[in-house]
Amino acid sequence: AIMTTVSGTNIREIPDIIDLVVAQKVDIFAFGRYCPTSFEKSTHIEPLEYRDFLERIWQKFEQYKDCGTTFNLKDHLWTLFLYEKGLFRIPDATDADTIYDGCHCGDCHMTILPTGGVMACRRFDSPVGNLFREHIHHIYNGEKMNAYRQYEKFKKCSRCELLRFCRGCPAVAYGYTHDFFAADPQCWKEINQNYE
């Protein structure tokens, strides 16, 4: 399997990487977006540029759909992309209080470090406890982890019909703004602009 990171620095190289992955008969390919650790400008991708990128990558995936490589749609903005194309539909029988997919931070994953430290997400500094001092059950159900489950606090996503299925990447948003609940900087969906 091969996974790569996409940023403004290498976005134009990804289609060639896909060609190489297929030529080398790699079994799985995926990519994730770069999470800046400061307010870097050189790596930024504009929202519509990212949407156009996903369109080009989707066409590549379709071109190679029978090649034997599984293309993992890891980035949660694929949900928005597929929704706009009519390839993802919100199921009729869904519970308004249930998170079905999208970012799993605080929901169904955590990162355990060799020091025993537990992070809500591996992609940004999000300490929620330490296994050497607390039981994992208490960490998972604790106040610090619950802070990441406040879906109504998402400044843009909380008003989007895809809230329970997407939420973009809050770690990327955090890398740009130091606010976990800020709008995903590559999300192109137009929502009432008064979300800040």
Q: What are these regions, as identified by a protein language model?
A:
Residues A1-G106, T111-R123, P127:
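Radical SAM enzyme [4Fe-4S]-AdoMet core and its adjacent flexible, acidic
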Residues V118, R122-E196:
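Flexible mid-to-C-terminal extensions adjoining Fe-S/redox cofactors in radical SAM and related proteins
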